[in-house]
Curated annotation (Swiss-Prot):
Localisation per UniProt entry: Cytoplasm
Gene (UniProt): Myo16
Domain of life: Eukaryota
Comp. bias regions, Polar residues: 1547-1559, 1672-1681, 1776-1812, 1909-1919
Organism placement in taxonomy: Eukaryota, Metazoa, Chordata, Craniata, Vertebrata
Protein name: Unconventional myosin-XVI
Organism: Mus musculus
Length: 1919
């Protein structure tokens, strides 16, 4: 069972331990099972005897490696004697010397070096023993390797040298730095050395590429140059390879890509670079690992995971989409430093952590032990935090002239003191001295540090505002801005006495900076406050000078991101903790605050558990315990302890860990109570209280015996020999106290490291370049009655800081002025600080050097320090340090056995007594005590003593700043090395080693071998602090203490004056007034003010830097500056003035950039708009070209249809001319019988609308064959596709209003000439299989008509009020058992957008008889779905009629289905298939056996359309909201040309053969109409109610102006459908017509889909005609916006324009008050006809010639704006125009007779015969006539009209000549027109034509008109 290491690390500790235990048990179990099986397989013969021991022999190489690891030195020597090879390699490729460096075996390492082992041997990762020794911090090995000649410049695979792995502050790092300094190598030259390898490879790659080498060339392992560069981190090489086309995703033989290698070896910059160049993060290597799986750090892993997500999104989108934000990536790549090679301190491996946790008996509940709790952002619950619950107060004093003391006119000590005292009395505690800030501690809380005040001091430049007084926030703001201006660290240095307010000032500065520049202000600010509180509890004490006195040096570093300019983290470094205060406190002073808080804050139960029942009895706290502590103080300490617990929880300590900390603190107190006694005469110490010792050992979790032995004896190991030495009582007490101090010091270091880990922002990438703002807070100068070694260290620290301030402010300026030749007005004496510091810190003759020498002595009975100190005082040349007591002869008299001296500090004279200084200086535990504490089972204690100390005495952090997963250094844990060392570890004496190797200058300067002492730690701490300060720019804050009693409002003049004098405030004022505090070099000046210089100087590259600086200062008009040899000398106010000028320039630059960016953005927008306009133009051009092709096809079909008509007429006239007059009644009966029976579908409930289709309704598309006459009549309005199922029924009755031909004889006679030229296409027989093609063309007898038969195309009748329930077909008693019913729903019973469509076709029962006239209805097909062309379909002209066959629907399609009632077997197919209503997009694909025929007829061939026969029905109308789920049904009326009809004026350019098509109204979307049922076209055509209709509402008009309403407006059905995209251009033969079957039939609840037909009219003039409402057959209601679907999604079938027959009119027969407003124009002679058969019967039964004279195309030949017939009706009654009745023809087709406003009172007729417009009757109940005549009058008008038409047709003698003339005129008309394409592009609406006034000449082209109808090339009679 194997588990990934990352998985174990992610689990909680408790769960992880349980999992590990279970794994361990399973492994043991599996091991025993395997052994049992193995024993069974071996058999009983091979089993060993029970008592016999087996011997296992290992090789010498394995044995010597194990001996080196476990420090078995004798065994190693024995193995080497036996022949073991000292050059043996380990598994990683390293030598035995690598193992010695790993496990700190110095003795064997020396032996191996003597045997000739290579000290520079490199393993597989190029690590040398020096690398490992530095990573594990083994300084003995480091020194040994250096002395053996190891090369410290060798680089590993990552390009790191050994120094890069040495943790800063460790002894190994100090040794290497000293060695490099000895060799003269500084850090800059070291960087050049590290860059030699990448520069060498860069040169080689350039040469290789210039010589024509392949950039992707691979070696034997498939590795390319890009692989090598990415693994090594050579950014320049990678960029070069990428520029030359390096393969980003190239793989080697193991399928590793360059991204894999860059991620594995932690090359963060290269990972970003590869991802920016579109490297694929999803590629896997041979192990199936992606780059994110092997990433070396969490930041790289997070980056790769984001890249993987972006790559997946890129794959989903277009290929051009980038995988990452390129701008962001390259922004990250700019100004990024190389990956820091400094590795963090190493951590315990997870196995070691689990091992220690299992041993830890303190943590019973390990599931909570080390689990970090969520950080709580609340402040510490203590009264020390001011104004927590109080409202925020703001108190800002107005500015005063004394805000800057440097501007005072009178300058002396008294004037300075007076100004400071005056300001202090006004609570103005802040004052400026130039750039130096002066702070006076008020000893009270002032409301000047609130958040509102901090907002007031925010500045864009960091300059002091003249309207605000001096403030601490202003100083912090200036430091923050200079951080980014100078791009170097800034240091804020606070100095002053104890109690002067340094710590509080530093806290306010950090609070301001974090709130101003923190990215997550609340979280970080809260953590920082809690961290400060923890440092205060463990690092501060209560003294007589200050209640919260700092006992250490704090250096806070706030890390700011240079690019984002916000704080990313913080870090605290502590120095010189007064750990001696734990065991002994000066008189009147207390111990650390934490012990006081524990005493007052712990409960009784907690004290009992910690054995602290009598807290005051402990020796460590009883010395400084104050007896006058009030009850309020105890309560306050309890609150402070609770706040401390909360703060520890915030930074990551759990409750159990906090309790463990308190156990350690309690153990420290109990350690101080251990007493020793002497039981023998040798004065050997023994523990007197064994019970207390056992109690302490239990708290420390160590062995009692081992602890007692470690306290009383000293055990040392030397080459296998054990040396034991007993301690005396004095020595035992010393080591006891030293253990307590060391334990507290290490615990404090552990807390500091935890705080630093918490304050590090883990979300920020560690490769981001940061700048630091340092805040230095040192313990203040102090003087007591008795000053000892601790006070000396404190005051020397202040002396050093004061000397640094004086050196920076005075000495450096004086020196630079002299060097640069600049005169300085005042000079400052350096004082005697240099002499004081030299006396103590000079080497090797300084006092601290003497003290360290004395501390090296193990134990001396007679101290030698007083004698040595006397010699030092006598030899010293300084007067700053001298002997305190001298007799009359001048001899020094010492007090007792101690040593004393007096020091003249900068702050005054202080005498120190050095008694016991040697013991206090010692700071190193014995090896025996150290080993006992390392073996503690307490995790924290074991960790504290296994960690090493830095040279400054701080605990080296074990928390990594960033992790490198899988990196080799994580395997080299120094703590595991220490823990594996046994008790027999041999410690080689350094002196012998040095004697053996010899002395050298390096060893003398190294000064190694000294024990860790307080003096050495102080020296190195001050050196470290000074080095940090020198790296940045200083900002000084001088803190003044007003009195020694800590009383608010008290100002002690003498005390304050003394502080002003030794701080040198007067000298600082004079310096800033006359000196030059700002002294940048020429290059730094030009770099800092580069924008200003570039604008002021322009192109001055040839000038010297000095001259350029001079010009800049002159043009800025500054005064008082000077130019030196290499530097510019400026006053402190010059910086603010230059910053103001730079800010003004920056604002102007920003304004210019804003304007330019706006201009570019507008240009980009215009470019995008231009591109979009081009796309729109291209689409329009495509649509126009498609429309032109459709028009060409349309014109060709017109000619072909005319030829077919002529041919067919010639044949029929010869066959049935005589029988036509004799047997019309018998033939009608015969035809009804042939099509009757079960094959006829008779509808008694659905008034089938008749659609008058003309030749203009032909398909717009190319045709392979000329369609026949019947195919012409079956053209679809909406799509223009010829449908084979939309053929007209045989011999329908004609309406005289149909203006094409009066009879087939007339058409045949007119088109006889075209028959000869048509070719084969015209001579083919007509492809009809029914009796229509074979019957004699004798008009059938007129069938009996029922007055209830309303088979009309008028919308008013279709959408009229519903019939009574007794006449509805859905009533069961009136329906035949074998009939098909169509059930319509009421429009008001369903929602407008989702009407119910239970569509049935009921057959009549009672009203049906054999004599009822059948109506033939054709099903509109959907052959061409989705606009595709069916090239392999049968010829569209070869159409054969076939009866309709119905099938039952079945579920499965989301669209609406047609449901049928039970019908007779002949009506249905055996296979029941779902009737799917095709949507416009054709989502539901047809079955493969249905070909082009829609689903209702799956077994019909494409050329055999179905034919429906409907019997008469008494129903007047159907509900307006229903639509049939069947494909639209159409009743075809054959067009009739009559000469006695008055035609309206033809629109310009319309076709002579398509008058009705030209009047087709286009809808809102300018789409063609569907000739199907109006009920299928949506619910917008509603019938008027029985009562007068309400005023019409606004009709939906999404695309164009709607026609004039002719009735109540349609109910809105939702928003109009979105227009569909452009259809593909037709290529090839036209597809089978889909017409209104799919595109315009809105019966299915399908989603909004665009239609498959063309979304544009066949001619642009039709748009004009439709919008202008010039046609006579326009609908009287608004066009429907959408069809009415069934409940479900709102059907949004794009509506198609409707044919002239589908017009909605009000049902005028219901009530006399129901009228529609007049339409602009309407044919006056239109009259009601019952059915197409009635029309034919009335036409052919007359027996006369149908064409009387050559006037068949009279309307077409009329010019625009004129009428052929000038005869007006004699009826001038006003009622005729007001009522504006609508008539019906004999087919029940309503034709509006309403006239325009100019002709409202005139009804035209031809030849002077007035035609009365009668109305149809409704069940004999009510009639409405315009003239007020009765039914008989209406009948006479109708009969007389028919008689006139037939009579005029019979008078025609030469019909063929007339029609031939018509065709010739049309051909010439189109050939003569050239710019017909341009005319299509201007479909503006036109005004209605004027009333007729003149009859034009026959076949004369109108003046000024242009035929935009047909191209000339299509007018060919041969087609």
């Amino acid at each position: 069972m194997e588990i990934d290491q990352c998985l174990l690390e992610s689990l909680p500790l408790g769960q992880r331990q349980r999992l590990v235990k279970r794994m361990r048990c399973e492994q043991i179990k599996a091991y025993y099972e395997r052994e049992k099986v193995f024993q069974k397989q071996e058999g009983p013969l091979k089993r060993s005897k029970p008592g016999k021991r087996q011997k296992v022999r290992f090789g010498l190489a394995d044995m010597i490696q194990d001996a080196v690891i476990h420090h078995h030195d004798k065994e190693v020597l024995q193995l080497l004697k036996e022949g073991a090879d000292p050059h043996t390699l380990v598994s990683s490729g390293g030598s035995l010397l690598h193992l010695c460096a790993r496990y700190d075996n110095v003795f064997i390492a020396e032996v191996l070096i003597d045997r000739g082992v290579n000290v520079n041997h490199q393993d597989e990762d190029f690590w040398t023993p020096m690398h490992i020794a530095c990573a594990c911090d083994n300084p003995d090995i480091v020194l040994l390797l250096i002395l053996a000649g190891a090369n410290v410049f060798l680089q590993d695979v990552n390009g790191n040298i050994p120094l890069d792995y040495a943790v800063e502050g460790t002894e190994s790092s100090a040794i290497l730095l000293a060695y490099l300094d000895e060799k003269g190598v500084d850090l800059s030259s070291l960087r050049q050395i590290k860059l030699q390898r990448p520069l060498s490879m860069l040169t080689d790659v350039r040469h290789f590429l210039s010589s024509g080498g392949d950039v992707n060339e691979k070696n034997d392992d498939g590795v390319t140059l890009l692989h090598m560069a990415c693994a090594s981190g050579y950014k320049e090489v990678v960029l070069l390879l990428l520029e030359h086309g390096g393969d980003l995703n190239g793989t080697d033989d193991r399928y590793w890509t360059p991204l894999h290698l860059a991620a594995k070896y932690g090359q963060t910059t290269l990972v970003k670079l590869l991802l920016a160049h579109q490297a694929n993060p999803h590629l896997v290597n041979c192990n199936g690992e992606k780059p994110s799986d092997i990433a070396a750090s969490e930041s790289i892993e997070e980056m790769l995971l984001k890249a993987e997500i972006a790559w997946e999104e890129k794959m989903k989108e277009s290929p051009s989409a980038p995988s990452l934000a390129q701008e962001e990536l390259y922004e990250i790549l700019h100004d990024l430093p190389d990956l820091s090679s400094k590795l963090s301190p190493l951590v315990l491996p997870i196995a070691k952590q689990d091992s220690l946790l299992e041993k830890d008996i303190m943590f019973k509940d390990t599931t909570k032990g080390l689990c970090k709790q969520e950080s709580q952002d609340g402040p510490p619950e203590t009264s020390m935090t001011s104004n927590c619950g109080k409202p925020e107060q703001v108190q800002v004093m107005p500015p005063a002239p004394s805000d800057d003391l440097a501007t005072l006119s009178e300058l002396n000590d008294s004037s300075l003191l007076y100004e400071i005292q005056k300001r202090f009395g006004n609570d103005q505690i802040h004052t400026f001295i130039g750039d130096i800030f002066l702070l006076v501690n008020p000893f009270k809380e002032l409301p000047i540090y609130s958040t509102m005040v901090s907002q007031m001091y925010l500045s864009p430049t960091g300059q002091r505002s003249p309207s605000l007084p001096p403030h601490l926030f202003s100083c912090a703001e200036r430091a923050f801005h200079r951080l980014f201006q100078e791009r170097k660290p800034q240091n804020i240095i606070l100095s002053g006495e104890r109690g002067s307010g340094k710590t509080q000032a530093s806290k306010q500065i950090m609070k301001y900076l974090t709130s101003r520049a923190s990215s997550s202000c609340t979280m970080f600010d809260s953590r920082l406050r809690h961290a400060i509180y923890i440092v205060e509890a463990f690092g501060h004490a209560k003294t007589t000078l200050n209640n919260v006195s700092s006992c250490l040096i704090q250096y806070w570093e706030l890390q700011c991101c240079q690019r984002r300019k916000h704080i990313t983290g913080a870090r605290i470094s502590t120095y010189m903790l007064e750990k001696s205060r734990v065991v002994a406190q000066p008189p009147g002073q207390g111990t650390f605050l934490i012990f006081s808080w524990l005493m007052d804050g712990l409960s009784s139960e907690e004290k009992c558990g910690l054995h602290l029942n009598n807290f005051c009895a402990h020796r460590y706290v009883s010395q400084g315990m104050r007896e006058d502590v009030s009850t309020a103080e105890h309560s306050l300490n309890k609150e402070r302890l609770a706040a401390l617990k909360h703060a520890l929880n915030v930074i990551g300590f759990s409750t159990l860990e906090v309790e463990n900390l308190f156990v350690i603190l309690s153990a420290i107190l109990h350690i101080g109570d251990i007493q020793f006694t002497a039981l023998t005469e040798a004065d050997s110490a023994f523990v007197s209280d064994l019970q207390l010792l056992e109690q302490v050992a239990g708290m420390l979790q160590v062995s009692t015996d081992e602890l007692a032995s470690a306290l009383t004896t000293d055990i040392q190991y030397f080459k296998g020999d054990v040396i034991i030495r007993r301690h005396t009582i004095q020595m035992a007490a010393f080591y006891r106290d030293l253990l307590a101090k060391s334990l507290y010091s290490r615990l404090f270091g552990f807390l500091i490291n935890t705080v630093n880990c918490c304050l590090q922002n883990q979300d920020e990438y560690k490769s981001l370049q940061t700048l630091d703002i340092g805040i230095l807070d040192i313990f203040g100068f102090e003087e007591f009655q008795k000053n000892e070694f601790e006070q000396l260290c404190v005051n020397l620290t202040n002396e050093k800081m004061h000397h640094y301030i004086q050196e920076v402010l005075f000495l450096q300026e004086q020196t630079e002025c002299v060097q640069e030749g600049v005169a300085m007005e005042t000079a400052c004496s350096p004082g005697n600080q240099a002499g004081v510091l030299d006396f103590f810190f000079q080497k090797p003759s300084g006092f601290f050097s003497l003290l360290d020498e004395e501390s090296q002595v193990i134990w001396s009975g007679e101290p030698n320090l007083p004698r040595k100190l006397q010699g030092l005082l006598e030899s010293s040349n300084t007067n700053a340090v001298y002997s305190p007591v001298k007799d009359g002869n001048g001899n020094v008299a010492f007090k007792g056995q101690g040593a004393a001296f007096t020091v003249m500090h900068y702050a005054g004279r202080v005498m120190y007594e050095m008694g016991g200084a040697v013991e206090r200086n010692k700071d190193s535990l014995s090896q025996n005590l150290l080993f006992v504490m390392k073996t503690s089972e307490n995790v924290v204690i074991s960790h504290l003593f296994q960690s090493k100390l830095s040279q400054t005495g701080s605990l080296i952090s074990s928390y990594p700043s960033f992790k490198f997963g899988g990196h080799k250094s994580t395997l080299l844990s120094k703590r595991t090395a220490s823990s594996m060392v046994g008790v027999n570890k041999n410690y080689l004496e350094l002196s012998k080693l040095l004697k053996k190797k010899g002395t050298s200058t390096f060893l003398q300067r190294l000064e190694r071998g000294e024990p860790a002492t307080a003096a050495s730690q102080l020296t190195k701490s001050l050196a470290d602090i000074t080095a940090k300060l020198q790296r940045g720019s200083p900002h000084f804050i001088l803190c003044i203490k007003p009195n020694t009693s800590q009383l608010p409002g008290v100002f002690d003049h003498f005390y304050v004056s003394a502080q002003l004098q030794y701080l040198g405030v007067l000298g600082l004022v004079r310096l800033f007034r006359s000196g030059y505090p700002v002294r940048p070099s020429f290059e730094d000046f030009l770099s800092r003010y580069e924008p200003l210089a570039s604008v002021l100087l322009g192109e001055t590259k040839g000038q010297a830097a000095e001259e350029r600086c001079r010009l800049v200062l002159q043009r800025c008009k500054l005064q008082g500056w000077q130019i030196g040899v290499h530097k510019v000398f400026l006053k402190y106010w010059h910086v603010d003035q230059l910053s103001d000028l730079w800010l003004q320039l920056q604002r102007k630059i920003v304004t210019c950039q804003k304007v330019i960016r706006g201009f570019l953005a507008r240009q980009h927008l215009l470019q995008r708009m231009s591109i979009k306009q081009q796309e729109v133009t291209s689409i329009k051009s495509f649509l126009q070209s498609t429309e032109d092709m459709a028009l060409k096809t349309y014109d060709a079909l017109v000619i072909q249809n005319a030829s077919d008509i002529a041919r067919e007429h010639d044949r029929l006239r010869k066959e049935v001319h005589t029988a036509y007059h004799r047997n019309r009644q018998e033939e009608g009966t015969k035809r009804a019988e042939d099509q009757g029976g079960c094959r006829h579908v008779h509808s008694n409930s659905v008034p089938v609308p008749m659609v008058v289709d003309s030749l203009a309704q032909a398909l717009t598309g190319p045709s392979t064959r000329p369609p026949s006459l019947h195919s012409v009549f079956s053209m679809d309005d909406s799509t223009g596709l010829p449908s084979p199922r939309k053929q007209p029924p045989p011999k329908p009755k004609r309406d005289p209003n149909t203006r094409l031909s009066a009879s087939y004889e007339a058409v045949s006679a007119c088109l006889s000439a075209a028959k000869d030229a048509a070719g084969e296409a015209l001579t083919r027989p007509r492809p009809h299989s029914d009796d229509y093609s074979t019957m004699k063309k004798i008009p059938p007898r007129k069938p009996k008509r029922s007055p209830h038969t309303k088979l009309s195309g008028s919308y008013e009748e279709i959408w009229g009020p519903p019939r009574p329930s007794g006449t509805m077909g859905q009533g069961g008693r009136h329906q035949a058992p074998g009939t098909l019913s169509v059930q319509w729903a009421r429009p008001d019973s369903v929602p407008q957008c989702t009407p119910q469509l239970p569509l049935h076709l009921p057959l009549p029962q009672g009203d049906y008889d054999d004599d009822a006239e059948p109506v033939y209805i054709e099903m509109v097909g959907n052959a061409a779905r989705a606009g595709g062309s069916e090239t392999d379909s049968p010829d569209q002209g070869e159409s054969v009629y076939e009866e309709m066959k119905y099938i039952l629907p079945e579920e499965g399609c989301g669209l609406g289905m047609l449901t049928f009632l039970p019908a007779s077997p002949p009506l249905f197919l055996e296979t029941r298939k779902a009737i799917i209503l095709e949507a416009a997009e054709g989502n539901c694909q047809p079955s493969k056996d249905t070909c082009d025929i829609p689903p209702p007829f799956p077994n019909l061939l494409p050329h055999r359309p179905p034919l429906l026969v409907f019997p008469p029905t008494p129903v007047t109308r159907s509900p307006a909201s229903d639509e049939s789920p069947l494909t639209p049904l159409e009743v075809k009326k054959l067009p009739v040309l009559e000469t006695n009809l008055k035609y309206p004026v033809q629109s310009e350019g319309s076709s002579p053969l398509s008058p009705q098509y030209s009047k087709a109204q286009k809808g809102d979307n300018d789409q063609l109409a569907s000739p199907g049922f109006p009920v299928f076209n949506g619910p917008s055509r509603i019938s008027p109610p029985a009562t007068p209709p309400p005023p019409p509402g606004p009709p939906p008009a999404p695309c164009g102006p709607p026609p004039a309403p002719c009735g109540p407006p349609p109910a809105p059905c939702g928003p109009p459908p979105a227009p569909c995209g452009p259809p593909p251009a037709p290529c090839g033969p036209p597809p089978a017509p889909c017409g209104a079957a799919s595109a315009s039939c809105g019966v299915a609840p399908a989603p909004c889909r665009p239609p498959t037909h063309f979304a544009f009219p066949p001619e642009s003039v039709l748009v004009t005609a439709a919008k202008a409402l010039t046609n006579s057959d326009l609908p009287r209601t608004q066009p429907k916006p959408s069809s009415a679907p069934v409940p479900g999604p709102c059907s949004s079938f794009v509506k198609a324009p409707y044919s002239p027959g589908k017009t909605a009119r009000a049902d005028l027969r219901k009530t006399s008050s129901t009228f529609s407003p007049p339409s602009p124009y309407s044919p006056p002679n239109s009259r009601p006809l019952s059915s197409p058969l009635d029309e034919l019967a009335s036409l052919f039964n007359s027996g006369r010639s149908v064409l009387r004279r050559s006037a068949v195309g009279r309307r077409i030949r009329e010019a625009e704006g004129f009428e052929t017939n000038m005869n007006l009706s004699s009826r001038d009654e006003p009622s005729s125009s007001e009522m504006a009745s609508e008539t019906q023809d004999r087919n029940a087709n309503n034709h509006g007779t309403q006239l325009s406003s100019s002709l409202s009172s005139d009804v035209t007729a031809e030849n002077g015969n007035p035609v009365t417009n009668g109305l149809a009757e409704d069940d004999g109940c009510s009639r409405l006539c315009l003239s007020g005549m009765g039914t008989s009058s209406f009948q006479r008008n109708r009969e007389s009209h028919t008689t006139q038409v037939i009579h005029q047709l019979r008078l025609s003698e030469n019909e063929s000549v007339a029609l031939q003339e018509l065709l010739d005129w049309r051909r010439k008309l189109c050939e003569a027109r050239e710019g017909w394409q341009e005319a299509l592009q201007h479909p503006e609406p036109r005004a209605p034509p004027p009333p007729p006034c003149k009859k034009p000449t026959l076949l004369k082209k109108p003046e000024g008109g242009s035929c935009t109808r047909l191209p000339s090339q299509l007018w060919d009679s041969s087609m």
